[in-house]
């Protein structure tokens, strides 16, 4: 896994994705990692005042009541030439008083692709010591594996480095999937680090608990002709490890727990249906594809496929709410917030609701895409005179509302790393041949001019930005709250793989 490097070059303001919910974080004053005049890192408030004095060699955002910091060992200096493999295990955890609660002798991973493991304030950190990994003299075979554990954000529990690996995409359950040295998976308690269900299941992408159940594969100790260990049918267990019986010929679906008391199941004919969390059949297997139930504008629904190109939306009892032929994609309709988009004519894209009704159609020369509504009920659309096969940076984006009215013309470049946060969209504008970043507000107006070389989403009222060799935080008016200078250009989370032609 990619290590979490906590230096001045990594400041991520990411959006929570949900997770462990039995503990909640009391609302406290937001703290932001910042570099002081002494070159060390501490934490400022929204006014730019240091509440935790600069004393660390690196710092990350607080998650709940804890943050990961770095303290380099004597003699180590991080530079652009530093090889990743030579970076020491020098990360630990502090609380909101700045007190160290886990000594900086570990390496942490928080997640990737803009997603935290289990949610920003509700998830875990993946913890290890890479220095424990020992290779042979040719560096081809490991002589000793590094051990892995977790730090639980809500409870503040550190499990210790007790396993070969863990599955960090935790759910809202108290149990974390862990993997032992025999490559079997079991479950540990997030709040104590103690084993609850012994490691006895197939360990390939182990299931988290959802709705009180998880789907697991029991290991078949018989080996096939290639010498690989097999696995039996997938079934359900509860949080004590007790198996939940399913009807004959019915198997649980791996990765799935109970969503709204519905567990996806499959029969011997490979058709999908649904049972409840007690293992009772609710919707007879009849679909060639199926999805988990989720909240939508039509209530709690799931998208299913009856036959080739024949898709529908069902409720919790299997009643068909809508059904239509959809030929444009092998995996069927992709609803987001209850809507999907479709190319309906030359230079025309339409927004459709879950009943297949057209909300609006947008006809523009060279239009190549239309997005689904964001939290502010606006949709991005993209125009590209060269067609839809060109690189993303050659497209220009605009915004349209739910009435099909264009809020801003397609004149902006939209970074693929950014979403919508606290009323602002990050956009890119070409100025004198250089890409500069700024922010649009909900009206589509340029609220903060495109003057930044790097920019992050707003989080708790501030956004991290960079201008040349200066970086720091701005408020929602674009005012500099706290900035510092650096000698070398930092690593940028905003990157472009190619130059515009």
Model features per residue range: what roles?
Residues 1-4:
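Positively charged n-region of N-terminal signal peptides that target proteins for export
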Residues 6-7, 344:
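General helical structural elements
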Residues 7-16:
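Bacterial N-terminal signal peptides
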Residues 22-501:
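Residue-level detector of conserved, function-critical positions
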